[in-house]
Amino acid sequence: MHDIRLIRSEPENFDKALSRRGFEPVSKTILEMDGERRTLALELQTLQTKRNEVSRQIGQAMKQGEKDKAEEMKAEVSAIKEKMAALEGEEAALGDKLQRFLSTIPNLAAEDVPEGKDEQDNKEVFRWGEPRQFSFKPKEHADFAPALGLDFDTAAAMSGARFALMKGAMARLNRAIGQYMLDCQTEKNGFTEIAPPLLVRDHALFGTGQLPKFEEDLFHTTDDRWLIPTAEVCLTNIVRESILDEKALPLRFTALTPCFRAEAGAAGRDTRGLIRQHQFDKVEMVAITTPEQSTAEQMRMVECAEQILQNLKLPYRRVLLCTGDMGFSATRTYDLEVWLPGQNCYREISSISDCGAFQARRMNTRYRPEEGKGNAAVHTLNGSGLAVGRTLVAILENYQEEDGTVTIPEVLHPYMNGITKLEII
């Protein structure tokens, strides 16, 4: 959500910044609605002052025995109250209309974010690791992993497309990946582990920016709850409607959860394999911090995610997303893209975003600065640390052998109960 005071004071700059994200100017529309609401608020204030004055005069008239005059003024007060009630309803309706409009406008991009339309305009800023040189033509995981226990057909029979069922060592490897990532974030990187609910109310998704704009991408239950598309929703909403002490910041939360996405806009894309599923596991990182520390905190989170890829010896690159490819709530986003030899390309495996004060204003989350007066909006950040399914894909493709087996990375051996290779079953 945007600060209406900023739009009032710098409407041209607001429109200019919004145009970088491919949006038409909206400050005029916003200020017209805001002006109408403020005019009504001023009229209400004037009427309240008049009501109070007439009420005072009624008391004086009663003391002086002027009952008829007092009765006339009582009728005047009743008329004022009726008019105020009508104006209050109009003001509330205008306020709701303004808030609904503001809630559909994306965050503004940071100055260092490259301007562009889509992923073709993203900027690669770092690359790690050299792709493995195979002595055979590497396959896509969807072509050989079913023989190792990755069952798409059985999952489709019970749930439909974009679901997977894992058996035996494959299931254990999937579990090991998530557990290893969670251990890294909690034991090495200082995140507090959270076990959150998987169903949330509207206000939680509004706070992080998924609602109202992206309803079609979510699963909605009949009792008006929503399956979480990411643990970001739960972890960020921990501080909803809170005023935090600056000395308590940063707060860092992490969770390993299933995530659920309708993928309404992904028809025909990534229909094979694990890349795009309705249900998948992910380790999420969330940080709550001050405006002064948010950029440094974002880079720290990037490093937390990259360290896992390096420990798994998976080649990857870091990409700074352009204005047209960023998520709705982000002011700056880095994507980590892992090398998939079967597809002969890099694919996103983590997205780490600084959302500035955008989500904090939607959640009404503030902090008390140690120096100075008043409260200020916190900055929120989120990122994958990492997506479990896509990490499994990366391991399958990068560690595949010519005989169809897959060697398991050494750092996962402690979680595998002696299993060091996925064998054909």
UniProtKB/Swiss-Prot annotation:
Function as written in the Swiss-Prot or TrEMBL entry: Catalyzes the attachment of serine to tRNA(Ser). Is also able to aminoacylate tRNA(Sec) with serine, to form the misacylated tRNA L-seryl-tRNA(Sec), which will be further converted into selenocysteinyl-tRNA(Sec).
Catalyzed reactions per annotation: tRNA(Ser) + L-serine + ATP = L-seryl-tRNA(Ser) + AMP + diphosphate + H(+); tRNA(Sec) + L-serine + ATP = L-seryl-tRNA(Sec) + AMP + diphosphate + H(+)
Listed pathway(s): Aminoacyl-tRNA biosynthesis; selenocysteinyl-tRNA(Sec) biosynthesis; L-seryl-tRNA(Sec) from L-serine and tRNA(Sec): step 1/1
Residues reported to bind L-serine: T230, A231, E232, E284, S384
Keyword Aminoacyl-tRNA synthetase: yes
PROSITE patterns noted in UniProt: AA_TRNA_LIGASE_II (PS50862)
Any one biological process term the GO annotation gives: seryl-tRNA aminoacylation
EC number of the protein: 6.1.1.11
Record note on domains: Consists of two distinct domains, a catalytic core and a N-terminal extension that is involved in tRNA binding.
GO cellular component: cytoplasm
Keywords, in A-Z order: Aminoacyl-tRNA synthetase, ATP-binding, Cytoplasm, Ligase, Nucleotide-binding, Protein biosynthesis
Gene3D superfamilies per record: Bira Bifunctional Protein, Domain 2, Serine-tRNA synthetase, tRNA binding domain
Pfam family, one: tRNA-synt_2b
Subunit structure: Homodimer. The tRNA molecule binds across the dimer.
Name of this protein: Serine--tRNA ligase
Family named by the database record: Belongs to the class-II aminoacyl-tRNA synthetase family. Type-1 seryl-tRNA synthetase subfamily.
Transmembrane region(s): none
InterPro entries (alphabetical): aa-tRNA-synt_IIb, aa-tRNA-synth_II, aa-tRNA-synth_II/BPL/LPL, Ser-tRNA-ligase_type_1, Ser-tRNA-synth_1_N, SerRS_1_N_sf, SerRS_core, tRNA-bd_arm
Subcellular location: Cytoplasm
GO molecular function (one): ATP binding
Residues annotated to bind ATP: R261, A262, E263, E348, I349, S350, S351
Main subcellular location of this protein, as a coarse class: cytoplasm
